UniProtKB/Swiss-Prot annotation:
Binds 2 Zn(2+) ions per subunit. This is Hydroxyacylglutathione hydrolase. The keyword Glycoprotein does not apply. It comes from Legionella pneumophila (strain Lens). The gene is gloB. The keyword Metal-binding applies. Its cofactor is Zn(2+). Keywords: Hydrolase, Metal-binding, Zinc.
């Protein structure tokens, strides 16, 4: 089985698992249907499973058309009235079998109130939707900043070699903000230079080890990150206070 990012909209990735021997593919958060249909038809594949992380349209917008094309397709996602056509509503603590892959469901509210991620421990894969980005994290919509903070603390506990399959290509812009927070962080500087030199615009998947060195939202315990937050209105150097200031500053960062 191989993993391929199929581009959608301006910066979305629809992560796709391809099993050519079985003649099937599975995908995560298909915000658009056309790219998946084109790929499947050109490779003579049948869509078997859709995994959804949350209700935002750029993650679920293609589902209706895809299940019309493949009526037997299974659709997994969080229990949320804003998501229709789920064949398998799932909760935290449940698991999902997709071919040979066995995903653990992680409840990661914050970006939204019902956001989930799919973690495959044997492969070391994390499909985290909009909760964690490379060098960044999602905005808070109908979740809370406290929930988002806890969700990222959970990710910090995963094995360092865990690959992170984010849903958007935001890495370069996130690194610019990370450099503002930690201008002396050589890991941020070096990674930004590496990305600017590489021929492909795709910077994903990332991994936990890299993110712990470049992502300010995972580095709220670092002195320079604390000082940045305190200088921008943090009430204290506690992790949550630092995290909240970082998120607020990133919201308006150009």
């Amino acid at each position: 089985m191989t993993i391929l990012p199929i581009s959608a909209f301006s910066d979305n990735y629809i992560w796709t698992f391809i099993d050519k021997i079985a003649g099937v593919l599975d995908c995560v958060d298909p915000g658009e249907s056309a790219p998946i249909i084109r790929f499947a038809q050109s490779n003579q594949l049948t869509l078997r499973t859709i995994l959804l992380t949350h209700h935002h349209y750029d993650h679920i917008g293609g589902v209706d058309s895809l299940i019309k094309q493949w009526p037997s397709c299974k659709v997994y996602g969080p229990i949320d009235e804003r998501i229709s056509n789920l064949t398998h509503p799932i909760k935290q603590g449940q698991s999902v079998q997709v071919g040979s892959l066995h995903f653990h469901i992680l409840f990661n509210p914050g970006h939204t109130s019902t956001h989930i991620s799919y973690y495959e421990p044997q492969q070391g894969w994390l499909f985290c939707g909009d909760t964690l980005f490379s060098a960044g994290c999602g905005r808070v919509f109908d979740g809370t900043i406290e929930e988002l903070h806890e969700s990222l603390l959970l990710f910090k506990k995963l094995p360092r070699n865990t690959k992170i399959f984010c849903a958007h290509e935001y890495t370069l812009q996130n690194l610019k903000f990370a450099h503002t927070v930690e201008p002396c962080n050589s890991s941020v500087i070096n990674y930004m230079q590496q990305i600017l030199k590489q021929p492909s615009p795709c910077t994903l998947p990332s991994n936990i080890d890299l993110e712990l060195s470049i992502n300010p939202f995972l580095r709220t315990d670092k002195e320079q990150v604390k000082q940045y937050a305190l200088s921008h209105g943090a009430n204290s150097s506690d992790s949550l206070d630092v995290f909240e200031v970082l998120r607020n500053q990133k919201n308006s960062f150009k």
